[in-house]
Each structure stands twice: as structure tokens, then as C-alpha cells.
Amino acid sequence: MFDPKYLESGEFYQRRYRNFPTLIIVPIFLLVVFIVLFSLFAKREIVVKASGEIIPAKVLSDIQSTSNNAIDSNQLAENKMVKKGDTLVTFTSGNEKISSQLLTQQINNLNNRIQSLDTYKHSIIDGRSEFGGTDQFGYDNLFNGYMAQVDTLTSEFNQQNSDKQTADQQANHQIDVLKQGQSKNNQQLANYQAILTSINSNTKPTNNPYQSIYDNYAAQLKSAQTTDDKEQVKQTALSSVQQQIDQLQTTSSSYDSQIAGITKSGPLSQSSTLDKIADLKQQQLASAQKEINDQQQSLDELKAKQSSANEDYQDTVIKAPESGILHLTSDKATIKYFPKGTTVTQIYPMLNKRTKLSVEYYVPTSNSVGLKRGQNIRFVANQNVTKPLILTGTIKTISSAPIIIKEESFYKCIASINVNVREHEQIKYGLAGKVTTTKGTKTWFNYYKDILLGNTN
């Protein structure tokens, strides 16, 4: 029978509850419970590690090759300080220089020709030569030929005018002679009419050269015996005088007809000659203007070719467009040719305490899940010192498409970094280091679960 007094014995409890299984299982159980609870609630950072280098936040200039010619002089060097206008690369430029010089010579020749044409045009407008001497293109001779044609037209008009004046003078002389004859005839007619009047009125005329006719009539009339005889004498005398009057009147009419038959041309108009001169002037001006337009078109074409040739010639020299520090995208120092359009170098801004910096790095596409802008990064410089440079920053840009590098694909990331004045003194462009990007956090339970399931992101 079990003795109850043993229940109060410490030895009983010690032997019953402080055995080996009890001391091992309980702590292990508690440890497992703690680990499970820790893995469910405790979190760890999910990071992506990559290699990166420090670059400026803003590149001043990307310089590309401007010629396919062989390199004549190469002044490129990594981290070399350059000033604006410094020569970086020169290419061989034999053909480009000759072409530019020939085009310049042709353009100068065309400019001189157009200037001579303009002088020729203004000479025509002003009607006098504005050439200071012999024109090298012969436009002074062309103007002299034009003026000779104008002088010919003017001389023709002057000759016509002179001939007209001579003809008019001859006509006026003929008219004067006829009028003089008509005047004498009219005077005779007046005298005969006066005799006729005297016979009719039996009044003796005075100062009349034909008074003898009246005197003869008066004598016959006096010798007549009868009235009929007197009447007969009178009628005979009147008839004789009337015949003379009729003859003189006919002669006077003949003079009028002759005078009327002598015609003179009207005033000789110069408008026809002036019109011919004006037409000639317009033809010459139109011809000169057309030639000016043609030459100007040729000049524009040559200038376009010259501009292209000058660009080709200028393209044989690459100069720094900004002051800064050179960064070579690859080793360009020993290359003999830069294909046109390829990037030769970049110009970074001068490093000072105000220079904003970034870190450029590449993340494999296999680790890109969850990567986004605004995530924090930490940059640890590859420096052989006890305390390397550590910088923090934030992702600003992620390339929209992966980049193939050595048959592997990466996403390009650029993160802005925070740098104080002391840290600036330790930094140079191209300083390499390790970049750790914090993509987020997850519990330890989910972390190991993802490892077991093969999800490494």
C-alpha cells in the first residue's frame, strides 16, 4: 500500500519532474514556439545588390562623331578637364577644304556678276552709265549698245522732223508765190470792176490803170449819134470789161484751188519714237532682271552647297561645347576611326560642393520584380580603406526596357544620392562601388517559404 507521507517529500517531486526528458523537451518546445512566432512577426529587408558608379545628375553634353574620315588628332582622356572651345578630335580634311574654297570662289564671282548686273540695270533706268570703268563681265558694252539703239531711234525722229520742216518750207514758199499772184489778179479784178461800175454810172474813174478803157468808151459814146448807137457802145464796152472780170475771177479761183491743193503734214509726234524707246528700255530691264534672278538662284544653290561643304569641313574638328570634365564611354584613345553619329565622349560638370550627383547601376531582369522609383539605395565605395565611403539615395529612373550587356539583360537604374561637403572631397566621377537597393520587407516565414518554393525575388 502506497504510503501517503511520501507525497510530501521533495525527493519524490525531484525524481518525478526533474528527469532528463522533462529538462530537454520543454526548452526545445519553447524554442520552437519562439522561432515560429518570430518568423511570423519579425521582418527582414528584401534587397538587390549590384555594382554601380557615381555620375553627375545632369550630363552637360553628349558629343558625337561628325565625320567618317580618319582621325588626325585625338585629345580625349578620361576625367580630363576641358574648356569651351577646346579641340577634342580633328579628322583629315583634304577634300572638304578644297571643296569649300572652290565654292567660296564661285560665290564671290556670282556676287560680282550680280553687282554688275545691278549697275547695268540702274544705268538703263537713269539713262547714263554708272560703271566706274571697264566691267569684267562686259555689261558696260551691253549698256553702250543699248544707248546706241536709243540714239538711233532719236536720230531717226530728228531726221523725220528735219525732212518735215524742209517740206513745210517748200509748201509755204509755193503758197506765198501763189498768193502773190492771186493778190495781183485780185487787184486787176478790182480795177476792172471799178471800170465796169464807172461805165454803168458814166462816171470817170480815178487812179485806175485801166482808165483808158473808160476813156475809149467815152469817146465812142460821144461820137454816137443816136440813142441806140450809144446803148450799143455801152453794151459792147460792158461786155468787154465783163469778159475780163470773168477771166480774172476764174484765175482767182484757180489760185484758190492750187493753194488748197498744197498740203502740209501735221505736227510730227514724238510719242511713237518715245514708245519704241520705252519698249526697248523695258525689254532690256526685263532681260537684266531675268538674268539677275537666274544668277541669284544659282547663288542660293551655291550657298546651300557651301553651307553643306562648310559643315563637312567644320565637322572635321570636334570642339568642346561646354567647360567640364570628359567621360569616355569606352577606350577611345587608340581608335583610328569614329563612325559618324557614334557617341565619342560626354562632358560632365565640374565637381564642386554644389554639383548634384547620382549613382548608375544595372539590375538583372531576374531580380527586377518589385523594383520601382522612390526606393532607397545604399552605395558603398570600392576603397581599400578601413572605413569606405557610404552614401544613401533614392531611385529616380528605371529604364523602360531591358538592356542587353554581354548576352545578359539588365534594367538601368539611376538614383540620386545625398552628399555632404566632406564626402564631396572623396568623390570623383566614375567612382565604383556596391549598390544595395531595398525593395521592401517580408517576414522570415515568407522569406524561407519563397526560398523553398524557388521564388528568389
Swiss-Prot record:
This is Mesentericin Y105 secretion protein MesE. Involved in the secretion of mesentericin Y105. PROSITE patterns: HLYD_FAMILY (PS00543). InterPro entries: MesE/LcnD, MFP, Secretion_HlyD_CS. Belongs to the membrane fusion protein (MFP) (TC 8.A.1) family. It comes from Leuconostoc mesenteroides. One of its GO terms (biological process) is protein secretion. It is found in: Membrane. One of its GO terms (cellular component) is membrane. The chain crosses the membrane at residues 22-42. It is a single-pass membrane protein. Keywords: Bacteriocin transport, Membrane, Plasmid, Protein transport, Transmembrane, Transmembrane helix, Transport. The keyword Cell membrane does not apply. The keyword 4Fe-4S does not apply.
